[in-house]
Every structure is written in C-alpha cells, then in structure tokens.
Design a protein with these regions (language model features):
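Extracytosolic helix-loop segments that constitute the early lumenal/periplasmic catalytic or substrate-binding loops
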Residues: 9-15, 27-52, 56-59, 63
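Perimembrane helix-loop-helix junctions
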Residues: 141, 147, 151-154, 162, ...
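Membrane-lumen/periplasm interface segments of specific transmembrane helices
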Residues: 226-342
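Transmembrane signal-anchor helices characteristic of membrane glycosylation enzymes that use polyprenol
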Residues: 1-26, 114, 193, 231-247, ...
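Loop-to-helix entry region of an early transmembrane alpha helix in multi-pass inner-membrane enzymes
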Residues: 51, 55-59, 67-88, 121, ...
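Transmembrane-helix motifs of polytopic, lipid-linked glycan transferases
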Residues: 74-98, 137-140, 344, 348
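Transmembrane-helix signature of polytopic, membrane-embedded enzymes
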Residues: 73, 90-114, 132-133
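Short acidic/glycine- and proline-prone juxtamembrane loop motifs at membrane-interface regions
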Residues: 117-130
Length: 450
C-alpha cells in the first residue's frame, strides 16, 4: 500500500511538471546534452559553463535525446528514473538486512525518499540525483558484499517500540558468486559516479563505512580489505580520465568553473577569508538574517551560511522559482520541526551506538556519511568563499537525507517513550506511526512542499 502511494505520488509530480524546466543552471546542462555525444564526450574545459564536469551525467540523457525527446525532457526523465532507482536500491538494502518490513525500516525508507528536495530533484534539471542514485547503489552493493545475508534473523512480528534485533555471526560467507556480483556492482557504481560529478568521490566512503560498521567479531580485516579493493578498482577506472583531462590541462584533478568565471570575486573573497579564517568558519554555522528580513526562500549572498543549505532541503530557493503559500507553510514546519527530531534521535542513537543490531549499524553508515557530506560542503565553501555564487546549496549534499530520515525515525525508537500502562496498545501505535508516514508521503507529493 505504501509503495503504491509513493509511486503514484512520483508519477503525479512528473505529470504535473512534465517538460517544465526547473533547476539552478538548467541552460548550462541542456547545452551540454545538446553538444556532447558518445563519440566526442568532451569539450574544452573552459568553453562552456558546465564543460568542466565529467561527461556521464550528460551522455545518459543524450541517449533519450537521440531517441527524439527534447534535451529538457530527456534530462527530466533521467532524473525521474534516477530518483526511483535511489529509492529501490535503498529498499533492497533494507530487505537484505531484514529491516524492510519492520516499522523502523518502513518509516526510514519513505521519510527519506519523500523529503521535499527529493521530490524536487526527481523532475528537475540537475546532476545530483544521479549521484544520489549511484550512492544508493553503492550502499546496497557494499552491504550485500560485506554483510552476509545469513547474518540476519527473520524480523517478523516486530513492534515499532521497542525495535531491538539480534543475530549470530555466521562463520560461512555467502556464495562466492554473489560476492563477486556485489563487488562488481560496487566498483561500477562508484566509477560511474566519479565520471558524473566530482562529488561522486565521496561515495568512496560508503564501502569503508560499511566495512567499519560491520557487526561481526571475525573476518573484520577480510571485509575491510574487500571494501578497499573495490574502491581501488573504481579509482583505477576513473583515474586515467581525471589525469588526462584535468591534471594535464589544468594542473589539478578537480578544477571548478568559478575559478575562472568569477576569478576576481573569488580572489577578493579568499583574501577576506584568510584575514580571519576562524571567523569565516564560525559564520557558516550561524543563522542568517536574510531569512527573517527577505523571506525564507531567499539566500544570503553576502555571507556563506549553512542555514541556506538546510533551507534548500525543505523550501524552494527563490532562484529556481516561486513557492506557493501552502508549500511555504509546510516547508517551514519541516524546517523547524526536524532539527528537534534529529537531536532527539541522535541522543538515542548515541546511547545504543555500541550495539550490533542491524538498525544501529545501518545508522553508523548513513549518519557518518551524512556528516561527511556536510564536511565536504564546508571544504567546498572554504575553497570557493564567494557568497554571491551561492556555494551553500542543499542540492550539493543530497545524500544527507539518509541521515536526516534515520535520526528522525530514531527519535521514536525507544520503548521508554511509551508509559507502562500504554504498552499493551503498541499494535495501535504501530499503525498510527505508519499512518503518519503515509500522510507525510501524500502531502509532500500532492502539494508538493517545494
């Protein structure tokens, strides 16, 4: 039922926005789809605004363009399919660790996949939804590779509160053929991400986190070695391209277009940053007055603020279009409610962090990877400190929705939240919580709240 509601919601959003161009730099991406081909996948790096990106994110919609679709619709359809792949790969991960049919797994899957920015990227012009889909594929493949399915007991007949799990560490690995398939899938997904956008480099952290968080007492080094080999193979596939196209021509492996399109502004911002680097970093974590003065849809173009990136997860940036009053009210509710859920869920997660239950160890991966995403955004802003360029975008850290959804669910994860005299009503609480998640999915797709 929930799956049907989710898919109908996605189809409804696609129907409503079909052939509508939404995005931060849609013209630049459309241009690359029009001029690149599989025979000539590169252009001079500085010739086009998006010419510095790796080519795969443009070549995939190019296939649809060759089939007769316009570049805009081709990109939109690729975004739609990528958003569904991100959902189904995450679903496969939960199925593998036997959480798919648990209340926690249901809530995590559908809350994470229905956060407003997730719905937005499913029909907009962007490359980041491809990175999210590939990241979800890497997570799925890494867990299949490093966490044998025999490790997990059947999790039927669970209550939403409490959610406790147990297992035994199997001595026998999965069949070798399954491990080979999972390893090849991990390598392929990471390599594709590296050839889609520079942020794909961060996906190398997922196999490492999966190996680090594995709950088995034996075989730890073996699993870490398997994860490391997968990452090395993926880097080996992408390295010749990075070396030949970027390092030889630009003198660095990751050139950014703002370094030449806004060179003077960047240099002035770097000088100002270097005068007080601690103050610069502190300002990132301070709230912006622009949201109160001009409205929450507006971005602070004077000082870089991570609060703008947080806003982007829930409310449309005015740069990409207008926001309806209903969508704004719903987005503001989420924007102010979820920090409290994250704090509460984080406390419960830290209390149980040493447990070897699959829910806890999944949290090790998704929470750590979300933190890694935020740290990478801070590093990016520090390198490109010109606030007028708007580097603090939530779109750049799209996989953080995993950590947000996980911690939000963890906020309701402790049986101590339920008074003793009410615990006989846990089956009713279970249905009520699933109903709340269904309402969340329906509202965000029906408005949609972005």
């Amino acid at each position: 039922m929930m799956l049907g509601l989710f898919l109908l919601g996605r189809i409804f959003v696609l129907h409503k926005r079909y052939a509508t161009v939404i995005g931060f730099d849609p013209g630049a991406q459309i241009e690359m789809v029009s001029i690149l081909s599989w025979a000539t996948p590169d252009t001079p790096i500085r010739e086009s605004f998006y010419g510095y990106h790796p080519p795969l994110g443009f070549l995939i919609p190019r296939l649809l363009h060759l089939a007769g679709f316009s570049p805009e619709v081709s990109i939109q359809l690729v975004s739609f399919v990528a958003s569904l792949l991100a959902f189904f790969f995450l679903r496969m991960t939960l199925r593998h660790i036997r959480l798919l049919h648990s209340p926690s797994g249901i809530a995590f899957l559908y809350i994470t996949s229905s956060i407003p920015i997730q719905i937005s990227v499913s029909t907009s012009v962007n490359l980041d939804v491809l990175i999210l889909a590939m990241g979800s594929a890497v997570l799925c493949a890494s867990v299949h590779l490093l966490w044998p399915s025999e490790s997990f007991k059947d999790q039927k007949n669970q209550c939403p509160l409490p959610l406790r799990f147990g297992w035994s560490d199997p001595v026998i690995r999965e069949r070798r053929w399954n491990a080979i398939i999972a390893g090849c899938a991990t390598v392929t997904a990471i390599a594709c991400a590296l050839l889609t956008k520079f942020s794909g480099i961060l996906l190398l952290g997922i196999p490492a986190l999966a190996a680090w968080s594995q709950p088995f007492e034996r075989g730890w080094w073996k699993r870490c070695s398997m994860g490391a080999v997968a990452c090395i193979c993926a880097v080996a596939i992408a390295f010749p391209y990075y070396y030949g196209r970027y390092y030889i021509r630009e003198g660095r492996f990751i050139p950014l277009n703002t370094e030449w399109t806004a060179k003077d502004d960047i240099e002035r911002s770097i000088v100002k940053r270097d005068e007080a680097p601690v103050r610069f970093l502190a300002q990132l974590f301070q709230p912006t007055a622009v949201h109160a003065a001009a409205g929450p849809t507006h971005t602070d173009y004077e000082v870089n603020r991570l609060s703008d990136a947080w806003r982007d997860l829930w409310i449309r940036n005015q740069w990409t279009g207008d926001t309806s009053p209903k969508a704004l009210r719903v987005g503001l509710l989420y924007m102010h409610l979820f920090p409290w859920l994250i704090i509460a869920g984080g406390l419960f997660f830290l209390e149980r962090i040493r447990r070897k239950a699959p829910w806890t160890r999944l949290g090790w991966i998704v929470v750590s990877f979300s933190i890694l995403q935020v740290l990478a955004l801070v590093q990016y802003i520090y390198r490109i400190p010109f606030a007028g360029y708007g580097p603090a975008k939530g779109l750049y850290i799209l996989p953080t929705v995993w950590g947000i959804g996980y911690l939000a669910v963890s906020a309701f994860h402790d049986e101590r939240l339920v008074p003793m005299r009410w615990r006989r009503h846990i089956p009713f609480i279970e249905r009520a919580l699933v109903g709340v998640v269904a309402v969340f999915v329906a509202i965000n797709h029906a408005i949609p709240a972005y």
